[in-house]
C-alpha cells in the first residue's frame, strides 16, 4: 500500500461533499459517535489555527471523476461539514468570542480563515496485490 500526503483547505472538502464526491460513511465506517461537545471543541481547535490529526482517504476514479472515500477521519470531517453548513452552533463547552454563533454569523474574515484552514490528508494510491 502506498500513500501520498498533501493538504487541502476546508473549502475543498466542503465542495467535494456538496458535489457528492466525498463518501463519509463507507460500509466499514461506524456511524457518527462524537458528542456535540467533542465536535465543538474540534471547531475551536480550527478557529485557533491548531493542527488536527491527518485524514486518510482512498481516491476512486469513476467515469473520469475523482471520488474520495474516507478511511479514517469521518468524525472530524462530519463535524467540520456540519459547522460550515450552519448545523453546529458554537455552544458550550466553547466559550470564546463567537459563542452561540453558527458559521454564517461569524465575521467574514473568520469564515475565510476557517475555509482556508488546511487539513493534512494521506491518500492511498496503490494497493499491493
Annotate the PLM regions:
Residues 1-12, 22-129:
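Basic- and aromatic-enriched surface patches that contact anionic nucleotides/nucleic acids
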Amino acid at each position: 500500500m502506498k500513500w501520498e500526503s498533501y493538504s487541502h483547505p476546508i473549502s475543498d472538502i466542503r465542495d467535494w461533499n456538496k458535489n457528492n464526491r466525498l463518501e463519509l460513511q463507507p460500509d466499514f465506517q461506524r456511524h457518527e459517535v462524537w458528542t456535540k461537545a467533542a465536535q465543538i471543541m474540534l471547531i475551536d481547535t480550527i478557529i485557533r489555527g491548531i493542527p488536527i490529526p491527518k485524514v486518510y482517504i482512498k481516491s476512486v476514479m469513476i467515469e473520469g471523476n475523482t471520488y474520495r472515500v474516507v478511511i479514517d477521519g469521518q468524525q472530524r470531517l462530519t463535524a467540520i461539514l456540519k459547522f460550515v453548513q450552519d448545523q453546529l452552533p458554537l455552544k458550550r463547552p466553547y466559550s470564546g468570542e463567537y459563542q452561540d454563533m453558527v458559521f454564517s454569523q461569524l465575521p467574514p474574515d473568520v469564515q475565510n480563515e476557517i475555509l482556508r484552514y488546511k487539513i493534512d490528508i494521506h491518500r492511498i494510491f496503490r494497493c499491493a496485490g
